[in-house]
Amino acid sequence: MIYGDYNQPLQIHIDKMISVPDEKWVYGAFNLIIDGCFYPGKEINWTLNIIINWLKSFLDEDINAYDMKNCEEHSAEYLFREAVISRIGYYYDEPEEKISLEELKKIYPKKVGIEISLPEITDTGLELFFFREKEKDILVFYFQGTVSKIELDMGYIHKLIASLPDI
């Protein structure tokens, strides 16, 4: 099943394939559909209830606790780089330039953007960060060496995630 508004460049595809009776795990395909492309890819078997619960935890995040970096003024690459550095102290290609934890807290008193990808998904190379500008929501994502930025109607990502079924 595909969740979301077809007038927006983001939908979520969930195909429940295997439900193990007497166990709490539900397996199946999970993809984000961004501008008509499936991420991370078709025919991947995921633990759906873990993914959906993780995504729904995003709904409880306080947007004001994060630095949105005037996202409408910056490129996808800049926003992604800042989001990564604010979390781990260096950018992936430059581990030798690691910032100390003390310095990191001075430079980035708040994490940049809200990370909405979980370890199972990032293991495929897909990373997602949410930003909010004055009138739009922004999704910055990285996949296979490319960083992209899409604009969505304000509140759309929250509405989309809230619409996912409890599995």
Curated annotation (Swiss-Prot):
InterPro entries: Imm42 (IPR028958). It comes from the Bacteria. Pfam families: Imm42. This is Uncharacterized protein PM0502. It comes from Pasteurella multocida (strain Pm70). The lineage of its organism: Bacteria, Pseudomonadati, Pseudomonadota, Gammaproteobacteria, Pasteurellales.
